[in-house]
Amino acid sequence: MSPLSTSAPGVRQAAFRFRCIACGTLNDSASQDFRCAHCGDLLEITYPRWKEASPDAAKLKSTWRNRRLSSEPIDQSGVWRFRDLLPALESDEQAITLGEGNTPLYELPQCARITGVPRLFAKHQGLNPTGSFKDAGMTVAATFARLAGFRWVACASTGNTSASMAAYAARGGLRSLVLVPDGKISWSKLSQALDYGAVTCQLRTDFDGCLRLLQQLVLRAPVYQLNSINPFRLEGQKTLALELLEQLDWQPPDHIIVPGGNLGNSSAIGKALGEMHGLGLISRLPKLSVIQAEGANALVRTLREAGGKRLISVQAETRATAVRIGNPASWKKAVNVLEATSGACEQVTEIEIAQAKAEIGAEGIGCEPASAVTLAGLKKLLKQGFVKPEESVILVLTGNLLKDPDFTLGFHRGDLFRGTPDESASARLDPWRRPPIVLDATLDAVIRTLEQAEKS
């Protein structure tokens, strides 16, 4: 019996409803744009029967730990392993899974020395099946798309969402439609969507334009939206926090720092923290902070210029393409999370992102540029005194190093910032560059290079 069951055998407490984040209206169903029928705001999934279930936190933890020893596919998923806190399935076989989740928590000794924060860790979501955190949400959302009877799923994307959606659609026997901004996403991400069979449309607009078109499309065609506006996506993504706390033996860190793009991930993690605290799984809430690229800083400006009351959209421009979003859909949810956890929101420059990415790479784990905003942001939060050196800090790395090889090669070759206003400032990055060395194919040439490297 599930630890969230009532006395009746087999009764699951993951029965859910859709709740508007603005007016609080509850509904048993949602329209295809996942907007409140009364006020037009975003929806979230809530579980009203949890309060009457009197959950046993110790049994939940034991159940989740024991499932890791199971050979069942659903238990091998680091998302569905926590299915007691997810929307219920009638049978485990309904889940579309690629074995997502169960990602590592790394110590960062070199970055710890650089920042002066000894207890510094990275939760690396880039080691999911398609190389990003999106897989944790997509396994749930794609599953419910198929259960709802849809043949087609669709998304607007800066790259990671399209790769993930296309993979899970293929796995679940669904067709997928991808809308991406032409020339503004990494080719490695685009190639994933192509290989997984997506119908891929490169639109002459930015991500925000792609998302606007998608929201019109789902109201006119039998297509299921799989962007993070879809609350099923966030239910899957919230398991990152459950898995993280399990890895920490349910002892909350002082800080969790997350990249900020469309803001669904920070919203999902914040939702999970609130639910865990309410269920007695953790004793206190960590501070969750969101870091944005300076050129895609809609949430930063929303908080500073409008007090978090209205969105200040921006024309996004950053080399960290995964967060190149100027009109984030989940901004209200993110504001609520920052308030609930007493978190911070900060922005970092392109140079700061590039340096932080190199520093993470020197740990032997690597990440895509958007993930590196977390380390760059930590440095700023330390200078401001918001983070204390003696506190524990988790950096959420959302994407794999291989997601954006052009950035990495450009950085090490020294031409990433060539011809830009940042070119002169980028000289400070020289100690971190490791350009490829072209040599004659002789032993002496290789030995001389080795000797020179030994001196550096």
Regions found by a protein language model. Give the residues of each.
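PLP-dependent amino-acid enzyme catalytic core
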Residues: 2-456
